[in-house]
Amino acid sequence: MKMCFPCLQCFCSTSDDKVVVSKNDKGGESGKKFRLFSYHELKVACDGFSSKNKVGEGGCGAVYKGRLTDGTMVAIKVLSVELESMRGEREFISEIAALSDAQHENLVNLHGCCVEEATRCLVYDYMENNSLAYQFLGREQNRNSFDWTKRKNVLLGVAKALAYLHEEINPHIVHRDIKASNVLLDHNFNPKVADFGLARLFQEGTSHISTRVAGTLGYLSPEYAVSERLTRKSDVYSFGVL
């Protein structure tokens, strides 16, 4: 079964056939490099997707810690995709569409992807301190070491990321799943908003879109859950819960 990925048409090849450069909405190069990885390369990076390298798992797949041949530590998200039903394909395309041209210090950095038959992988920077959820729901000593200064910095970082997604980048992006497990923390506890599998793009001047309700119970805004009208305020509500 031959697959077509229109979202990858926004990239142009360089002299290295494994590296592409994303284009901005005006047709010019944005300067952000995006790499196409082979499945074998990623399998070697995380020791055959060994369970000892698994750092997380969700409804869309598992995440593994890996080391590329140049020594770069990465997080490899392996999505569960069924080619017949296309389950998981929408999430894969949404993440690439949202992050391929986005550059902000409080967004997780997407290095590239792997597309081989039914395999769909996304490669990100590895976050040494896992997620905000891990810090608060894990060991008690993690919670005790997470002082108010760190908490304030995390909240400010997430707020800056949302302001960038909602106002600065075009098309605008609504994340739809802001929650503690989707806020990753680097070695200095700087927050990085992650997991754009449910994200939706908003063209300039668009106030809302009608779409099926998706997200996490407890973080969903009531008006979105009832009306199925998605706005940027839905992310703001989730941020308030966070």
From Swiss-Prot:
The keyword Mitochondrion does not apply. Pfam families: Pkinase. Disulfide bonds: none annotated. Its EC number is 2.7.11.1. The keyword Lipid metabolism does not apply. It catalyses: L-seryl-[protein] + ATP = O-phospho-L-seryl-[protein] + ADP + H(+); L-threonyl-[protein] + ATP = O-phospho-L-threonyl-[protein] + ADP + H(+). Induction: Neither up- or down-regulated in response to zinc ion contamination and in response or to mixed metal ion contamination (cadmium, copper, lead and zinc). One of its GO terms (molecular function) is protein serine/threonine kinase activity. ATP binds at V55, G56, E57, G58, G59, C60, G61, A62, V63, K77. Keywords: ATP-binding, Kinase, Nucleotide-binding, Serine/threonine-protein kinase, Transferase. Transmembrane segments: none annotated. SUPFAM superfamilies: Protein kinase-like (PK-like) (SSF56112). Gene3D superfamilies: Phosphorylase Kinase, domain 1 (3.30.200.20), Transferase(Phosphotransferase) domain 1 (1.10.510.10). Residues 49-242 form the Protein kinase domain. InterPro entries: CR_Ser/Thr_kinase, Kinase-like_dom_sf, Prot_kinase_dom, Ser/Thr_kinase_AS. The active site is at D177. PROSITE patterns: PROTEIN_KINASE_DOM, PROTEIN_KINASE_ST. Belongs to the protein kinase superfamily. Ser/Thr protein kinase family. This is Putative serine/threonine-protein kinase. It comes from Helianthus annuus (Common sunflower).
